[in-house]
Amino acid sequence: MPKVSEDHLAARRRQILDGARRCFAEYGYDKATVRRLEQAIGMSRGAIFHHFRDKDALFFALAREDTERMAAVASREGLIGVMRDMLAAPDQFDWLATRLEIARKLRNDPDFSRGWAERSAELAAATTDRLRRQKQANRVRDDVPSDVLRCYLDLVLDGLLARLASGEDPQRLAAVLDLVENSVRRS
């Protein structure tokens, strides 16, 4: 059997992830069946699951990519910066509109819940660290505990995703983010 190059494997993996992102965005997590994933990706289930153990692993790979990117932005610009990136390029985050399905699955599937918690920890850590640095620099309110501020920003993120998914005007949402940012800044 001919040896497949690392570049070829990486390109196939990228094709799988890009197709899966589109499929999850269009159908949501639960309705993104293996057949729909095959159609969106343009590969057989054997080819897809050669690279990813199962649908959860594929979904978590997307979550890992986005979490790493979001954590890097959150470290530099805070969670508000992440949300501004989402408004600037909503098509890059449209699959995250599945968060309502994810919330239900988190309550009912312990394995999924553990996997999701692992993927979310990096973004939470970056946000917490950014808030700590901003408090030390006297830029963020000190009358509210950091964990409460992070929870507040997480709630705003969830709402932003829901509004983007329902077609809300990104400019209006940007104005809301200005309000949120001012609410956490030190006066």
UniProtKB/Swiss-Prot annotation:
Protein name: HTH-type transcriptional repressor Rv1474c
SUPFAM superfamilies: Homeodomain-like (SSF46689), Tetracyclin repressor-like, C-terminal domain (SSF48498)
Domain of life: Bacteria
One record GO biological process: regulation of DNA-templated transcription
UniProt function note: Represses the expression of the aconitase gene acn and its own expression, in an iron-responsive manner. Binds to the inverted repeat element present in the upstream region of acn (Rv1475c)-Rv1474c operon. Preferentially binds to major groove of the DNA.
HTH tetR-type domain: residues covered: 10-70
Induction of the gene: Negatively autoregulated.
Coiled-coil portions: none
GO molecular function: DNA-binding transcription factor activity; transcription cis-regulatory region binding
GO cellular component, one term: peptidoglycan-based cell wall
Note: Its association with indispensable iron homeostasis makes Rv1474c an attractive target for designing novel anti-mycobacterials.
Origin species: Mycobacterium tuberculosis (strain ATCC 25618 / H37Rv)
Documented activity regulation: Binding to DNA is abolished in the presence of high concentration of iron. Specifically binds to tetracycline, which leads to a conformational change in the structure of the protein and inhibits the DNA binding activity.
DNA-binding region, residue range(s): 33-52
UniProtKB keywords: DNA-binding, Repressor, Transcription, Transcription regulation
